[in-house]
Amino acid sequence: MSAYPLYDVPYLVRDPNDFRMSAKRHQIEVRNQAVVDDYFVARNKGISAHEARKQVADKHQMTSGRVQVILIWFCKEAKKRKKYDFLEKFSLLEEH
C-alpha cells in the first residue's frame, strides 16, 4: 500500500447535456476518465508507472501507449482548466 491515500480524481468530463458534444464523444470521455481512475488506483498500490499502464491497458483493451496519451491529455486539460489539484496529485504519484 502506498503512503499516499487514494486520491479523488477530479472529473474533467464535460456535462453530457452540453449541446456541443455528441453521445460518442461523451462515451469516449467517460472511458478516458475510467482509464485515469484505474491508473491512480494501480499507482496507489505501489505498482510502477510502466506496470500500471500495462495493467490498465489490458483492462481497457488498448495499448499502454494509448493509456499514456490519455494521461498526457488529462494533464493538459487539467492545466487548461486550472485544475491544479489534479496536476499536483499526478506529479506526487509519478515521483514515487
Give the positions of each predicted feature.
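General nucleic-acid-binding
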Residues: M1-A23
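Short, Lys/Arg-enriched anionic-surface-contact patches
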Residues: P16-D38
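DNA major-groove recognition helix of helix-turn-helix
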Residues: Y39, L71, A78
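Short helix-to-turn junction characteristic of helix-turn-helix DNA-binding domains
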Residues: Y39-G46
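Short alpha-helical "recognition helix" segments of helix-turn-helix
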Residues: A52-Q61
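Short Lys/Arg-enriched helix C-cap and helix-to-coil transition segments
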Residues: E77-H96
